Structures are given as structure tokens and as C-alpha cells.
Amino acid sequence: RYCLLSRGLGDVYKRQPENASIVLGISHSAWLTLDLPKPLPQELVEFEEIRGPKHTAVSTPGDLHFHIRATQPSVAYDMASAITAALRDIAEVLDEVHGFRYWDGRSIIGFVDGTENPQTPAAREYFGIIGDSDPMYRGGSYQFVQKYIHDMTAWNALPVSEQEKVIGRSKHDDIEMSEDEKPANSHSAIANIGDDFKVIRDNMPFGTVGNNELGTYFICYASTFSTVQKMLKNMFLGVDGANYDRLLDFSTAVTGTLFFVPTVDMLGDFAG
């Protein structure tokens, strides 16, 4: 069924090559249920919640995750429809989020998102793709997702200068504050865990204005899940005298699941 799904989505892509892509993630529980190859990817586990002094990175169930991207919404719709048709009799949808690009790549809270992403192809491959450390799964990736709901009323009540202290960057031109002026509990101070530990973020804003449910769908890819876990622990538990990431006072994580992303060749091998 994986092979049929891949071929079907490939046909959609060929008809409408609108920067379309789809990434399939498989969770630890699904890996065991589907009796996929052993040993498992080295860091594929069930994500355990991280309970901080005030906020919690929750753990929620999920077997498969499909990350669909396309310039044209109609292409994304066709791809989602193909997935649904292929899996309707064996799976149910637990969550479906429709993201969108907000201005010049900003989050819905108005700040540029993904500034710390590795920029060169070599760096993105190094930090985002599994290498020789796990030869059986070389070329795959760890995908971690969280759905954050923002308290936009509280956020918009802050003056821009205070919002900038929460993020640790300027809002208009995306310039990082100096170490002297950046608060220790700012998002950029806590979520950035060093040049040797990076992930590939592909976050998207989502939501509906009418009911004021607006948020960020956090998606990251990494060659090691331990890097993601370190970042999350910093954010929710605190580090270096800061008790937690202050952005969490305005953003609540309502989901949290870890997946492994196999290559297309791996999927073919899984199907036999």
C-alpha cells in the first residue's frame, strides 16, 4: 500500500509540479504494529512529555504523519485526497492542520520564523539527515511535530518593545539582540542550543480569525532526536538561571509526537 500511495502521489506531482512535496513520518508504535525492520532507527521512541514548572510539552498519539506542501492549495488538496482514499479503510484522521505562508515567512505573532535554520545544502543535510551513525537508516530523518495555540489577545496587548524581549529579536527587521540586552528567558536565548546542535524548522501558521484560534504548527527535521529533546528541555524546564522560555506564556503546546521519515527506497523495501 505504501508503494501504491507513493506512485499515486508521484502522478499528482507530475501533473501539477507546483513546488509540491510530501513527507511521510512513522511513529514508534506504528513501526511495531506494522512489524517494520529491526532494529528500529536508533532514536525512534515514544515521545515522553516534558513537564516544567509552569508549562508542559505534551505527548499525544499518532501512527503516521503526512507533511504536505505546495504553492497551489489545489495541489495540496489533491495530495491529501489521494492519501485519504488510500488509507480510509485502515486509518482514521486524528488531526488535520492547514497552514499558510504569512507575509515574508513570519509566524502569526509577527516575527520572522526559522531564522536559525542551517542555510547551506551541506549544513541542512548534516543537521537534517541521518548519516553514518545509523547506517541501516542512512538518508532518513527524525520528524518532531507540535501544535501550539497562541493567546493572541495577551500577545497583542504587549507593546512591540516587550514582544521583542520575549523573542530576543527585533520585530520589523529580524535582528538578534546583543547578549547584554537579550533576556535570559527569551525564546532565541533558550531555543538556540548552539551552532553544533541545529534542526531544520518548517513551521507554519494556521488558524481561524472568527473564533480567535490561531497558532503555529511546529515541524522540525533532525539527524538526531536528542538535539530536539535538548531544545525542548531548555524551553520547558529552563537553563542557565532562566526558568523557562517566556514565549510559552503565550503559546500552549496541545500535541507532541515523534516520527521517523524513511527514504522512498526504504518504503519500497518495507513493502517487500
Regions found by a protein language model. Name each.
Residues 2-13:
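Single conserved hydrophobic/aromatic residue that forms the stacking wall/gate
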Residues 11-15, 84-94, 236-245:
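A common structural junction motif
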Residues 23-82:
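Long, hydrophobic/aromatic-enriched structural stretches that serve as scaffold segments
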Residues 58-69, 139-144, 200, 212-217:
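Glycine-rich, often proline-containing surface loops adjacent to acidic residues and nearby aromatics
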Residues 67-116:
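Long, hydrophobic, well-ordered secondary-structure blocks that form the structural core
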Residues 101-204:
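Aromatic/basic-lined ligand-recognition segments
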Residues 173-243:
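Extended, compositionally biased non-globular segments
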Residues 233-272:
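TerminUS-proximal long segments
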